Swiss-Prot record:
Annotated family: Belongs to the herpesviridae small capsomere-interacting protein family.
Presence of the UniProt keyword Nucleotidyltransferase in the record: no
Subcellular location, principal: virion
TM regions (residue ranges): none
Protein name: Small capsomere-interacting protein
Gene: SCP
Oligomeric form and interacting partners: Interacts with the major capsid protein/MCP.
Length: 75
């Protein structure tokens, strides 16, 4: 017999946090979370790890906009 308790796995918890960041914190459509843009993937991963710091949702929104804008500017 194994001592594993039924419940969410680490991957499920991570996916749940990811959906929370997209839908609640950033207020983005679900389609955005499935986008393959490298900046979105990187920033969503970063925000998911920072899940305890969501006091100011506007700061996260502005940070994401800034990172997308920086990535799109030509040098």
């Amino acid at each position: 017999m194994s001592n594993t308790a039924p419940g969410p796995t680490v991957a499920n918890k991570r996916d749940e946090k990811h959906r929370h960041v997209v839908n609640v914190v950033l207020e983005l459509p679900t389609e955005i979370s499935e986008a393959t843009h490298p900046v979105l993937a990187t920033m969503l991963s970063k925000y998911t790890r920072m899940s305890s710091l969501f006091n100011d949702k506007c700061a996260f929104k502005l940070d994401l906009l800034r990172m997308v804008a920086v990535s799109r500017t030509r040098r």
